[in-house]
Amino acid sequence: MADPYRSNGSAAYDLAAGKLLFCHEIRLDLWQTVRECMTLFPDLTVEVQGLDAHYRFTENPAWDAFSDHNQCAHGLARPGDDLGPFLKFTLYGEFRDVTVASMFDGTPEEVRRMDDAEAQLKARFGGCCEVFRAATRIIDVHAKGVSKNRSARELQQRLGRKILVCMGDAENDISMLEGADWSFCPADGIVADRF
């Protein structure tokens, strides 16, 4: 059986050894970026993903429940806290349920709001970051050039493997699934009809 590895695009981990294999950092000041996003998008939840946890910057019990349900280590960060390398930040719309699948639903107003936020992020950070819609109410921002496919291929190369096998279930997994030698999508995955 293959060793378990996990990658979100910005970082790859060897779960069995409990170690980071590689990461791609955003070349911006973390706290300046957080302040700017919180000012531009006061109605959205801003999250920063570090090596060890996901961090929020305001009290949000719904985000806590979402993170707990999805088994994400998380915490509340304060300005100046050392969150480690700046790997990724995310904007979330309203949390109505604890499942990731629930974030794919949105009212027309929510879709327009997230479209506007995505356009603003691309205009502001597109020169140094990859901005993409992970779900109807989730926008992810990674370092420039980062994608799940690129990271999966980097992991394959580092491990000396000939065949890349990937599994995913959502829109943000499509480039990785299409770029893999073998790909799998659960039958109930959001993009299952494409595979």
Regions from the PLM with identified roles:
Residues 15, 176, 180:
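Active-site-proximal flexible loops/turns
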Residues 7, 40, 127-128, 179, ...:
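Structured helix-beta-strand junction loops
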Residues 1-62:
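Active-site phosphate-binding/coordination module
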